[in-house]
């Protein structure tokens, strides 16, 4: 898996976008939008392609993704806040990293993670 910073499909409310890829497959996107109530904050929205949704189980993958998200967010003067719940069962990446599901529909399910200003 690799995470690439892109500027594709950005609206004026978008701070930055990260593409998640496995080889040539597009696994999903992390998009950070401006926070409606915090000028220096943002909201992360994540989209995972259906075929990859049940594969987000490794801690190393979660750590790699969050490290890259935090690194890029810091470049924009943001601080990422997320919580983790350690368990004996291999949790899915999104739940493990504190993402919340907010819109379930085919072919995508949307999740969010709050980002606060520094």
What are these regions (language model features)?
Residues 55-71, 96:
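Conserved acetyl-CoA-binding loop-helix of GNAT-fold acetyltransferases
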Residues 37-55:
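Conserved acetyl-CoA binding element of GNAT-fold acetyltransferases
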Residues 11-16, 27-41, 103:
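A conserved beta-strand-loop-helix scaffold within acyl/acetyltransferase catalytic domains
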Residues 81-91:
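Conserved beta-strand-loop-alpha-helix junction that forms the acyl-donor binding cleft
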Residues 95-105:
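Conserved acetyl-CoA-binding loop of GNAT-fold acetyltransferases
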């Amino acid at each position: 898996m690799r995470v690439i910073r892109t500027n594709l499909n950005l609206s004026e409310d978008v701070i930055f976008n990260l593409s998640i890829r496995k080889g040539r497959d597009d696994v999903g996107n992390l998009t950070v939008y401006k926070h409606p109530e915090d000028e220096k904050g943002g909201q992360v929205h994540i989209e995972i392609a259906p075929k990859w949704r049940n594969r987000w189980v490794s801690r190393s993958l979660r750590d790699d993704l969050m490290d890259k998200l935090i690194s890029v967010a810091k470049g924009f003067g943001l601080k990422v806040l997320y919580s983790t719940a350690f368990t004996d069962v291999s949790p899915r990446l999104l739940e493990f990293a504190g993402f919340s599901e907010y819109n379930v529909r085919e072919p995508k399910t949307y999740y969010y993670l709050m980002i606060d200003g520094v």
